[in-house]
Amino acid sequence: MRPSSLSRTALVTGGAAGLPRGISVALARDGFNVHITYRPGGTSPEKTTQAIEAEGVATSAHAVDFLAAPEKVAAQLDEIARKIAVDVLVHGVGPMVVKRFERATLENYDAMVNGNLRSAVQAAAALLPGMRERKFGRMIFFGMSGSSITMPARGLSLYTAAKSGVVAFARTLALEEGRYGITAHVVQPGDIREKERSRSDARARSAENAVGRPGTWEDVADAVRFLVREDADYLTGTVLDVGGGLTGAYESKSP
């Protein structure tokens, strides 16, 4: 049975590749119209939009460079909001720089903060007025496993700082917007290195977590599918860790 979507419309940022691509297709299978953004010069959105269209729902792709000047990003997002009545935001954009802090630069800092935190703020700001007007909205942001408790990750000082900011932002958004029928959540994927791997394939492999297998895009997509349901209206401000029970500090390999 498909979750109740009632022809709702989702916008998945970064939907051309990686985990956001899988989430986009999963939402389409649930009956959502799914529109995506993609980075100019990056992965072509065609593969994703074709997969969405195959599910019999509406789709479109929009070029948005979330690392561009804030005014340019705002204009691009406002244009999307004018054209599409978005009920569900899945903000999948979130670049990562793996580098010990002693080697990190201000350019790395800008990329992490702008690409992860500022991008989330701008996406929410563009879509919030429409959600308020329709008295319904679901916003999903992404942290990393442990970002809700500021768990350290060697080589990811700037990334973890930005993701912890995303958690604080989403929780505050949930507090302020709940009265308008808008919920906000953070999904924290664990160490998912092969973004195209299926769950059945992952079960044949091992990993150092409580479950004993690697995570997959399907695990993350199922979490998102649950949180954006019509009848998930009593859940908000949730930080859902999809990491196979992994606890403790990361030892990220870095140059």
PLM-predicted stretches and their roles:
Residues I140-G165, A170-R179, D191:
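Catalytic loop of short-chain dehydrogenase/reductase
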Residues G92-V98, G244-G245:
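Conserved NAD(P)H cofactor-binding loop of Rossmann-fold oxidoreductase domains
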Residues G178, T183, L235-G237:
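Short, small/polar-rich loop/turn modules that mediate ligand/substrate recognition or access, typified
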Residues R203, R225, T236-P255:
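Short C-terminal tail/terminal secondary-structure segment
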Residues A124-A125, R171:
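A short, exposed helix-loop element centered on a Lys and neighboring polar residues
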Residues R2-H35:
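Canonical Rossmann dinucleotide-binding motif of NAD(H)/NADP(H)-dependent dehydrogenases/reductases
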Residues V97-F101, N108-V113, R205:
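Substrate-binding pocket helix/loop in short-chain dehydrogenase/reductase
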